[in-house]
Amino acid sequence: MKETPLSNCERRFLLRAIEEKKRLDGRQTYDYRNIRISFGTDYGCCIVELGKTRVLGQVSCELVSPKLNRATEGILFFNLELSQMAAPAFEPGRQSDLLVKLNRLMERCLRNSKCIDTESLCVVAGEKVWQIRVDLHLLNHDGNIIDAASIAAIVALCHFRRPDVSVQGDEVTLYTPEERDPVPLSIHHMPICVSFAFFQQGTYLLVDPNEREERVMDGLLVIAMNKHREICTIQSSGGIMLLKDQVLRCSKIAGVKVAEITELILKALENDQKVRKEGGKFGFAESIANQRITAFKMEKAPIDTSDVEEKAEEIIAEAEPPSEVVSTPVLWTPGTAQIGEGVENSWGDLEDSEKEDDEGGGDQAIILDGIKMDTGVEVSDIGSQGGPKHWKNGADAPIILSDSEEEEMIILEPDKNPKKIRTQTTSAKQEKAPSKKPVKRRKKKRAAN
Amino acid sequence: MAEPASVAAESLAGSRARAARTVLGQVVLPGEELLLPEQEDAEGPGGAVERPLSLNARACSRVRVVCGPGLRRCGDRLLVTKCGRLRHKEPGSGSGGGVYWVDSQQKRYVPVKGDHVIGIVTAKSGDIFKVDVGGSEPASLSYLSFEGATKRNRPNVQVGDLIYGQFVVANKDMEPEMVCIDSCGRANGMGVIGQDGLLFKVTLGLIRKLLAPDCEIIQEVGKLYPLEIVFGMNGRIWVKAKTIQQTLILANILEACEHMTSDQRKQIFSRLAES
């Protein structure tokens, strides 16, 4: 299936929200989503949930002959797959670009950082070594696959136990799990990827972008670090220009985040170890709550609702009187009525005239200025609140429009669309004769001022 | 008399069809067969019941029952094709046995004729727009299907805009077609949806619940602050409020409404109202 396109209004909304430091799910700029790690019954199998993004990791091992140029080292093999259930856009042949990028990043993060001691995987030099294979499957895509995948890989590797092997002279004995307890892998450190999404050419940054944020981001910076603050891999994609201090700041943030995540991982591993030792039940089936419907459960989103009413009051105070949700139609002229606020006025600077207007319809004030030319006569005729007052109060009154080309047009803000004025002029042509007089009157007033 | 007999017969026979009336409000699974009311009497114990022949034409009175979503006609019975609860609506007036349907829950939308949906314009090719509605194919929308549109006066629609329209053609054999005018030629609220605001996706069941005539959620939300909402039957909701904060709160409330009981919801609304 084709990916659902991102509509213009979503993109605009997300960028505006990011400019106001607001995220869709109420997180702060540097917050991660909830990470949940659960283990399966076999050693080396785990599921990591980063918010709604889910990755399944499975580690397996096999005795093979080593590579020719590395006779004493074991072999590591990483594979990340984007399952079709993760997103409708993932099809068997389709997601090649993203897949290649993710796989390369995983390899660089785990293999090149030498987090696993490959020398310890050697059984008989030149003949038999262990091949460790890490398979990662993306089960659900809600943004930030890289972080979830790297956590799943390292957790699975730490959790895995390989069969014990003993070498006596020429004899190699491979023990089954029943004969001897399986042995954990020798892991030096735990590299974890932290993603930073950049918006508006590097002005705003977010940690752990979710799927919507990833769609509108300009670029992505991934830093793989371990808890000793050693950078294992760093990658910047999207072609954005980053300043040196931005990168340094990101690495500091990454250091903090990696420390937290590593703590979480160690705690999860410890818990699982304890449960297995005590003989309790473990595995995926146990991590699912029994006798409870969890399909209809949703985590609470920490949306800030504290100052909703304040902001609303500010808006209302500025546009007095407070507007009703359902407004009655305002009759401008026989045949033309208006309900609601209408689109935003683009004629001139209205805030000054609004503030000075102490009475009079708040919403209507905006529209009055907008169609003042058309309804110049009618305003004074109807005697609607504050109509003629505008002209007296507004020291910098908005554009005075004349419908006669002979009179000189005084444009207060020449950079605002001159085109608009033209179209308004043509529409006001019918009222040419009667409205001429009031225009002249007004102009005289201004001259006096 | 017929029901206990048929139930007993069912336990004997194993996979006997159940009477639709007895299963109302219960969960039914795909593959089940349901008997309509007048057939229950016919299917008595054993099947062969002797009835006095009557010369009156009234004897074979057939009631016209409408088969709604999730049900299919299979001979004289109803075959369930979706799992969910069985519902029934009495006919308002006149004859007819009412409507039977299955209340199921899903996220993937299948275009249905007459549904009002929110679509995203993906392409403009010649005279038609391709609009993504969440189905298997993009729907086609002609530029003349807007109010006041003529060959010279084209609507101002860009790629990436949101459109609220209804389907005129939607079956499994053809690509769906939608329009933004009703049969009188008026827009009636349809057309391009404004520039700001937030679009998000929910399940189809939640949309149906929110669009029910007596939905409390919308009334309560409306009391909080002024807002604009558009519901699309394809699971998409567009909201707009005065500030971004309010829009985000709205979006999260509506998404969470699905998982909240009405008590929890009232709690949250009262907390919002007083804060």
Swiss-Prot record, chain B:
One GO cellular component, as annotated: exosome (RNase complex)
A Gene Ontology BP annotation from the UniProt entry: DNA deamination
N-acetylalanine PTM sites in chain numbering: A2
Keyword field contains Iron: no
Annotated disease: Pontocerebellar hypoplasia 1B: A severe autosomal recessive neurologic disorder characterized by a combination of cerebellar and spinal motor neuron degeneration beginning at birth. There is diffuse muscle weakness, progressive microcephaly, global developmental delay, and brainstem involvement.
PANTHER family xref list: EXOSOME COMPLEX COMPONENT RRP40, PNAS-3 RELATED
Protein name according to UniProt: Exosome complex component RRP40
